[in-house]
């Protein structure tokens, strides 16, 4: 993966299955068969993609334009693209399973709103970034942040939780601005912790 062969471009939705492939083993719900599990993971991914021009993919021109990573951002007031898709695709599943997806949506919506409330109009939120190759996640973050800074955005916000490698953000220049416990996902033995980070662009 040489820098001169890398190209940052607008994300193409036809590549969404490649993103889902990466996070599917990490975000499997505890209920349903493999078909539902993948549906629910795609639902979570789509909950992080907005109707805007801040959807990117990093490709390697030396490898037939292979998709190396993807990154999705949200501004205050942006809308996510998931509602119509969910209404259509969820019809094949029973109400019990759709309730599980509803729990995911409640959590995602709450954390998005909590993060957006901390932001100013000239701040932007990193909703999701996914790497398919070692180092490609850091690279797309570097390139997109350069572009965002040039456009005048001031700060980058994101939220994550204890299921993810949240320590990575501390090591890469982000400041922890809020830490909470999400009771519905907590157990007697372990609190389910959520984190909101900020970094100056």
PLM region spans:
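Conserved acetyl-CoA-binding loop-helix of GNAT-fold acetyltransferases
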Residues: 133-147, 171
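Short hydrophobic/aromatic beta-strand element in the GNAT-like acyltransferase core
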Residues: 53-57, 70, 128, 194-196
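Glycine-rich phosphate/pyrophosphate-binding loop shared by adenosine-nucleotide-utilizing enzymes
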Residues: 4-6, 64-70, 124
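Active-site rim helix/loop that mediates acceptor-substrate recognition in acyltransferases
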Residues: 32-61, 72
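Conserved catalytic-core motifs of GNAT/GCN5-like acyltransferases
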Residues: 157-159, 175-193
């Amino acid at each position: 993966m040489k820098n001169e062969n890398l190209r940052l471009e607008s994300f193409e939705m036809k590549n969404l299955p490649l993103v889902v492939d990466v996070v599917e083993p990490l975000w499997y719900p505890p209920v349903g068969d493999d078909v539902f599990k993948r549906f629910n993971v795609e639902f979570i991914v789509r909950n992080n993609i907005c109707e805007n021009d801040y959807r990117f993919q990093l490709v390697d021109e030396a490898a037939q334009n292979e998709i190396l990573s993807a990154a999705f951002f949200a501004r205050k007031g942006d809308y996510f693209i998931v509602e119509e898709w969910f209404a259509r695709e969820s019809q094949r599943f029973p109400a019990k399973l759709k309730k599980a997806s509803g729990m995911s949506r409640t959590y995602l919506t709450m954390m998005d709103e909590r993060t957006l409330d901390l932001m100013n109009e000239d701040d932007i939120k990193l909703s999701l970034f996914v790497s398919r190759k070692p180092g490609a996640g850091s690279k797309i973050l570097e390139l997109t942040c350069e572009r965002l800074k040039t456009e005048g955005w001031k700060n980058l916000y994101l939220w994550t939780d204890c299921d993810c490698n949240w320590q990575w953000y501390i090591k890469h220049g982000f400041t922890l601005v809020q830490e909470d416990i999400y009771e519905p996902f907590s157990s007697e033995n372990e609190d389910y912790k959520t984190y909101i980070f900020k970094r100056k662009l």
